């Protein structure tokens, strides 16, 4: 009996540690967005995106070596890793382009449509069982996103749709990550994704530098950061690496079903940092949309949890 109680206490301690790390992620992740937004007035979005992956690779390499993970890429996994990097580039570029002109919390609220997209993609692409309740929750959640987009679209134009691009790209990124997570450790996966993403971004920057295209060259050509802009770029890389490490470690100690609903706490941090740094506060319509999105997302996680329990008890 004493041994059983000890095992239960150890399990509780691991879950508590996982929850603590997830709370750390929710606090740190918006700092990446803050650093990117601060850099965006003087640094092109493409350069901020590249800096994120370049610095993340530089930071993750010694961590990977210290943890004694292999740093070579297995050939069969190269294609999936490159695809993962590609979707993360798209997600990052769209989001940085959006928050360059939009409040961070507004953009993040739109991105939170991603679980609904992932749910629909799972049903259509992999024939996963998705009940009417979760489909209905997805539709309601998307209506909440429209409440956020509507005032943003009237103020910022087509840029307000960029977070939807982030959500779609991130949904594909998650599908690829699911496949890869069965075949490799998360820390080397982050290192290799950052390395391959950097390798894809650098030629684009070089083309922007050499090109004289009247529209694309100003968007893609790198510039020499001046003064404090160096600090913002460094912050992008540091906070990207730290947030990924926190969520990776959190998933090692606590089940994803426990941690997933907590992801919405990132919205609280985003609103707080957005107000403290930029003086941005969501209006009533945006807040209503956020509540609908978060509520629908939490309901979907609840239904998925019930489905998992039912499947486990039926075995």
Regions found by a protein language model. Name each.
Residues 2, 17-20, 43-90, 169-176, ...:
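Transmembrane alpha-helices of multi-pass small-molecule transport proteins
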Residues 115-136, 268-287:
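C-terminal transmembrane-helix exit sites in multi-pass transporters
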Residues 16-24, 64, 70-96, 158-164, ...:
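Loop-to-transmembrane-helix transition segments
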Residues 51, 108-113, 180-196, 241-275:
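Helix-helix packing/entry segments at the starts of transmembrane helices
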Residues 37, 45, 155-214, 218-224, ...:
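Transmembrane alpha-helical segments that form core, pore/gating elements
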Residues 133-150, 285-304:
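Hydrophobic transmembrane alpha-helices of multi-pass small-molecule transport proteins
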Residues 7-9, 57-76, 145-155, 198-228:
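Membrane-interface helix-cap regions at the ends of transmembrane helices
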Residues 26-31, 61, 85-93, 115-120, ...:
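Hydrophobic/small/kink-forming positions within alpha-helical transmembrane segments
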């Amino acid at each position: 009996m004493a041994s059983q109680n000890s095992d239960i206490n150890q399990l509780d301690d691991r879950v508590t540690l996982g929850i603590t790390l997830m709370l750390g992620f929710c606090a740190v992740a918006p700092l990446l967005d803050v650093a990117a937004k601060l850099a965006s007035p003087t640094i092109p979005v493409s350069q901020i995106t590249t800096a994120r992956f370049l610095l993340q690779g530089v930071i993750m390499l010694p961590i990977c070596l210290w943890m004694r993970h292999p740093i070579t890429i297995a050939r069969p996994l190269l294609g999936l890793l490159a695809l993962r990097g590609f979707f993360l580039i798209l997600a990052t570029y769209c989001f940085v382009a959006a928050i360059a002109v939009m409040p961070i919390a507004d953009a993040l609220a739109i991105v939170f449509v991603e679980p609904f997209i992932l749910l629909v993609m799972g049903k259509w692409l992999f024939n996963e069982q998705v009940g009417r309740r979760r489909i209905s929750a997805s539709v309601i959640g998307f209506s909440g996103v429209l409440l956020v987009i509507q005032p943003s679209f009237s103020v910022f134009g087509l840029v307000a749709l960029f977070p939807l691009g982030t959500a779609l790209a991130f949904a594909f990124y998650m599908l690829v990550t699911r496949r890869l997570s069965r075949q490799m450790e998360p820390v080397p996966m982050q290192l290799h994704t950052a390395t391959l993403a950097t390798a894809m971004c650098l030629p684009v920057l070089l083309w922007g530098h050499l090109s004289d295209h009247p529209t694309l060259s100003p968007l893609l050509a790198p510039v020499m950061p001046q003064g404090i802009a160096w600090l913002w770029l460094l912050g992008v890389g540091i906070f990207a690496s730290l947030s990924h490490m926190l969520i990776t470690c959190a998933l090692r100690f606590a089940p994803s079903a426990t941690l997933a609903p907590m992801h919405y706490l990132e919205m609280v941090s985003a609103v707080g940092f957005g107000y403290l740094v930029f003086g941005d506060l969501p209006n009533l319509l945006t807040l209503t949309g956020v509540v609908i999105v978060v509520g629908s997302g939490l309901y979907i996680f609840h239904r998925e949890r019930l489905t998992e329990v039912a499947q486990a008890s039926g075995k």
